[in-house]
Design a protein with these regions (language model features):
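Structural signal for interior beta-strand "rungs" in well-ordered beta-sheet cores
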Residues: 1-181, 185-186
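Terminal amphipathic alpha-helical/low-complexity segments used for targeting or macromolecular assembly
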Residues: 1-3, 8-9, 14-15, 51, ...
């Protein structure tokens, strides 16, 4: 910890490497076997799990960039086995949101220069490629991947196992298992390669396709399409996850452009 500025009341686990010029605040808890790179800042009210790596110049627990923030105590919580690369910024939560906490789940990977704003919730096994920017209160479900230089509007929800193409601007929710991209962002198919890598069977993937054919390709509005999928398709976990996501969407889901689609 030579040349590092670590508050004596910070709780540091076993086998933690703290590089030169790191700053760690008073109300910080870092789990075992972590590595904190040079010039990183871990500010107050941050809890970091075990086996995490935080690289050079990252700032974890910065004050929210939100005018509703009034200096209240709020938090960042990072799970186990998380990697946060150079110059990422992760802001604390806000009381105004009702969440008061920014969360990054286990086994997630934030590449260089990613920004995670106040009250975002990133699930487990997520990948955010370099220069991704998440606005406040964005939810990213488990196993989602967001391509580099993508910008995500506040309150947006990205579903489980979804993949967002690099350079996207998202202002609508991305339903589970989908690939989206282009400008404006549109649905372009199922994330088949990613799903097969994670052990999904073709039978499961076909059930996803069946749902999305009705949602996007029957000429119905989304509400009517969901009712049709509910009535016409047999029950399955995949159907339930997709329809529940759409039913609970607050911003509406991304549109479909048949000229851009890879859906079969």
């Amino acid at each position: 910890m030579e040349n590092a500025n670590v508050h004596p009341k910070a709780k540091i686990g076993k086998n933690v490497v703290i590089s030169p010029y790191v700053t760690i605040g008073e109300h910080v808890e870092i789990g075992d076997n972590c590595w904190i790179g040079p010039c990183a800042a871990i500010n107050d009210f941050v809890k970091i799990g075990n086996n995490c790596k935080i690289f050079n110049g990252a700032v974890i627990g910065g004050l929210p960039q939100d005018l509703k923030f009034k200096g209240e105590e709020s938090y960042v919580e990072i799970g186990n086995n998380v990697m946060i690369r150079e110059f990422c910024t992760v802001s604390r939560g806000t009381a105004a949101s009702g969440k008061n906490k920014t969360i990054i789940g286990d086994d997630s990977f934030l590449m260089a220069y990613v920004h995670v704003a106040h009250d975002c919730c990133i699930g487990k096994h997520c990948i955010l490629v370099s220069y991704v920017g998440l606005a406040g209160e964005t939810d990213v479900d488990d196993w989602a991947i967001i391509g580099g230089s993508s910008a995500v509007h506040q309150f947006t929800h990205i579903g489980t196992h979804a993949m967002v193409a690099g350079g996207s601007f998202l202002s609508k929710d991305v339903p589970p298992y989908a690939i989206v991209g282009d400008r404006p962002v549109t649905f372009s198919g199922i994330n088949v390669v990613g799903l097969r890598r994670r052990g999904f069977t073709m039978e499961q993937i076909d059930r996803m396709r069946d749902v999305y054919r009705i949602i996007y390709m029957n000429g119905l509005n989304v509400s009517d399409a969901c009712r049709a999928a509910e009535a016409e398709l047999p029950d399955s976990p995949e159907k339930r996850i997709i329809l529940d996501f759409i039913e609970n969407s607050k911003r509406g889901i991304v549109r479909y452009n048949p000229l851009k689609s890879t859906q079969e």
